[in-house]
């Protein structure tokens, strides 16, 4: 780490994630670093390459040399003074392409929360549109996020329609697919397209797969908006999509619109930070987005997912608020139309009431263009808390802002939008009629209402209106917190794995495991030796590992229906599968990599409980091929093993990805790993996914 990078990380307001790159809890050290940072000139910062990679090259290319020359003499303190002055908004609009991404990071580091809020509330980057447009000063919109743990079309459709009834979705309908194969992407793109076109909605739609798979899907269906997660280093981007910035630039022009997601913490928790702090990495991601927009001229939005990872990044509501303010200001300084996903995982310790209060504060202080909107406060597929449909009418009233004029007019025409969100059945009838259904409107409304009731009975947060007594999120939160402390059922383990070895991670107890994730990534020294002694002769090609993860209930509920079937399929295919499975208490995903390094296994299949909060206890399987293309072990250090080298099969549950389908998928993927001698993004690339 060079001196400038060190000054940048020490100048940050404290967040746990920065401890990975040299951050400190010491207030005195941080104050001194902010003083040193304030005295630096923008020219000094612009000359420094924080990382030698394509992201840095992209940041240089995004700058206008003439404008950069005009601001090079300014110190970071000068920039702060200008931005907070009455002329600040006009000044940055004229000079933004001369201000480097790292300079944007520097200036927010030396601002208080109050100063960040003052600045954010006078910076707006609207997209084209008549009347109140996305990102304009009077606008506050949303992305409907209609996720389904099994990609069920009725669940997705009814979730969208109820969201529309609350006035949500004016920015985009954006679905995270539970299964990320191209066929599923095509099917879901067509569903979203049918909603937009049948109801003649003035909004966009997107299935949030990566831009490579979307490009493949686009040859068979309309993909309205291209999606990609961005990051502040090439290493992080390559780990997500096996493309660097130039690869993204090659694919982006194929889409009429672009939607990027970012968020502090992803690079530092995946060993891809390159010694750069979280705020600066986030600013660098915005610089990449700026370059792509400059080169494509596309309609573009960015969404900062703040709070999605867990307590290893943010532990308190104050940190979440700070991150949202920092990120919104930095994005606006780049000229980006910026939204937020103000969210919390169930193991952070931020409860539903606190998150609602934080959301209100952030909407007022950060003035984002939009937030997420889900059927209930808990996403039924991703397992975290965010903003519900029901909150949006209240947030619009509190801020005095509204959805786009075009969307408001269309929802009025459809007689759809109410404060209580109770007209989803009417929208269902209109949707069916537009698709050619000849039944009466009353019949269709009754059918829509019945489907909503059925989904509610199955646990979906639909059809309740704004009933103040509806407390399902409280129950989900309580159950999720309880699930974090669940233990593995020995009967389930014995039934699923008659021969197994019980191992322990280095977590002292469950609280240590939750608070310090790294302790769950390595096996204890005593158990390491025992694992290495399990196979004195021939070691298996495929080693099965089982960990409780964040939810042992997921193992207890699903393992019996998956592990024996996977073993049968692999043995039938002629693979040498472990006679002794390794079961880890307080195990994280990387604990599976550690087992791989101890046994030099060719393939690790690691079954682990997904984090709770979806309303169902879902299981994941992480499949990792441990040899390189020369047949040499790539396991190395478990702590440094790249997550991009693994392939995940997620959402395994009878109400998500059915166990029998998961068994088939795991067996098929393992066969492809042996054939291609790789896994993760390399396997996707080899298979043209």
Enumerate the predicted regions with their spans.
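Catalytic alpha/beta core domains of metabolic enzymes, predominantly
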Residues: 216-375, 379-387, 396
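Alpha-helix-loop-beta-strand connector modules within alpha/beta enzyme cores
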Residues: 118-122, 136-137, 142, 182-210, ...
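Flexible, glycine/charged-enriched surface loops at secondary-structure junctions
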Residues: 200-203, 297-302, 335-337, 405-408, ...
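Glycine-rich, proline-tolerant flexible connector loops at the mouths of alpha/beta enzymes
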Residues: 95-98, 108-112, 171-189, 304-317, ...
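N-terminal low-complexity, intrinsically disordered segments
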Residues: 117-119, 139, 458-536
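Long, compositionally biased, glycine/small-hydrophobic-enriched stretches that function as flexible linkers
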Residues: 1-126, 437-452
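N-terminal small/glycine-rich loop or linker at the start of catalytic domains
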Residues: 50-55, 124-148, 260-272, 340
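C-terminal functional extensions of proteins
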Residues: 280, 294-295, 301, 611-689
């Amino acid at each position: 780490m060079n001196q400038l990078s060190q000054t940048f990380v020490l100048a940050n307001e404290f967040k746990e994630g920065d401890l990975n790159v040299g951050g400190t809890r010491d207030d005195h050290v941080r104050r001194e670093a902010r003083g040193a940072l304030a005295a630096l000139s923008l020219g000094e910062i612009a000359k420094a390459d924080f990382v030698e990679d394509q992201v840095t090259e992209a940041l240089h290319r995004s700058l206008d040399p003439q404008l950069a020359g005009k601001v090079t003499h300014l110190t970071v303190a000068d920039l702060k003074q200008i931005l907070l002055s009455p002329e600040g908004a006009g000044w940055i609009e004229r000079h933004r392409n001369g201000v480097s991404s790292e300079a944007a990071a520097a200036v927010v580091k030396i601002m208080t929360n109050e100063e960040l809020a003052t600045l954010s509330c006078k910076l707006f980057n609207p997209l084209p549109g008549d009347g109140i447009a996305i990102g304009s000063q009077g606008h506050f919109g949303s992305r409907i996020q209609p996720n389904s743990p099994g990609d069920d079309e009725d669940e997705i459709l009814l979730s969208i329609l109820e969201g529309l009834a609350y006035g949500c979705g004016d920015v985009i309908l954006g679905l995270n697919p539970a299964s990320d194969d191209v066929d599923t992407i095509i099917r879901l793109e067509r569903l979203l397209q049918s909603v937009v076109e049948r109801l003649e909605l003035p909004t966009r739609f997107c299935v949030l797969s990566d831009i490579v798979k979307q490009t493949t899907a686009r040859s068979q269906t309309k993909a309205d908006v291209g999606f990609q997660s961005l990051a502040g280093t090439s290493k992080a981007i390559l780990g997500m999509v096996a493309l660097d910035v130039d690869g993204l630039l090659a694919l982006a022009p194929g889409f009429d619109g672009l939607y990027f997601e970012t968020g502090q913490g992803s690079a530092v928790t995946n060993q891809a930070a390159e010694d750069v702090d979280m705020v600066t990495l986030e600013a660098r991601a915005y610089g990449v987005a700026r370059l792509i927009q400059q080169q494509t001229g596309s309609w573009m939005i960015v969404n900062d997912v703040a709070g999605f990872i867990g307590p290893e990044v943010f532990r308190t509501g104050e940190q979440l608020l700070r991150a949202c303010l920092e990120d919104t200001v930095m994005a606006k300084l780049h000229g980006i139309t910026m939204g937020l996903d103000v969210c919390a995982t169930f193991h952070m310790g931020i409860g539903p009431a606190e998150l609602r209060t934080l959301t209100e504060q952030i909407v007022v202080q950060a003035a984002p263009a939009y937030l997420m909107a889900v059927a209930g406060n808990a996403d039924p597929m991703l397992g975290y808390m965010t903003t519900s449909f029901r909150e949006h009418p209240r947030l619009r009233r509190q801020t005095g802002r509204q959805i786009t004029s075009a969307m408001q007019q269309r929802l009025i025409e459809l007689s759809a939008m109410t404060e209580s969100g109770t007209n989803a059945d009417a929208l269902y009838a209109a949707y069916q009629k537009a698709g050619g259904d000849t039944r009466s409107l009353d019949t269709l409304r009754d059918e829509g209402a019945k489907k909503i009731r059925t989904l509610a009975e199955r646990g979906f947060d639909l059809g309740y209106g704004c009933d103040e007594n509806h407390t399902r999120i409280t129950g989900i939160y309580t159950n999720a917190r309880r699930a974090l402390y669940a233990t593995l059922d020995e009967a389930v383990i014995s039934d699923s794995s008659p021969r197994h070895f019980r191992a322990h991670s280095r977590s002292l107890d469950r609280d240590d495991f939750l608070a310090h994730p790294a302790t769950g990534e390595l096996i204890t020294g005593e158990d390491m030796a025992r694992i290495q002694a399990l196979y004195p002769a021939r070691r298996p090609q495929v080693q099965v590992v089982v960990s409780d993860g964040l939810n042992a209930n997921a193992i207890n509920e699903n393992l019996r229906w998956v592990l024996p079937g996977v073993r049968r399929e692999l043995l039938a295919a002629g693979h040498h599968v472990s006679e002794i499975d390794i079961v880890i208490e307080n195990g994280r995903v990387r604990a599976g990599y550690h087992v791989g390094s101890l046994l030099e296994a060719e393939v690790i299949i690691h079954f682990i409980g997904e984090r709770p909060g979806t309303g169902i206890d879902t299981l994941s399987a992480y499949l990792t091929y441990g040899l390189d293309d020369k047949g040499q072990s790539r396991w190395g250090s478990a702590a440094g093993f790249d997550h991009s080298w693994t392939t995940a099969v997620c959402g395994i549950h009878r109400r998500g990805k059915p166990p029998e389908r998961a068994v088939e998928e795991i067996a098929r993927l393992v066969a492809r790993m042996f054939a291609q001698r790789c896994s993760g993004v390399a396997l996707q690339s080899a298979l043209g996914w």
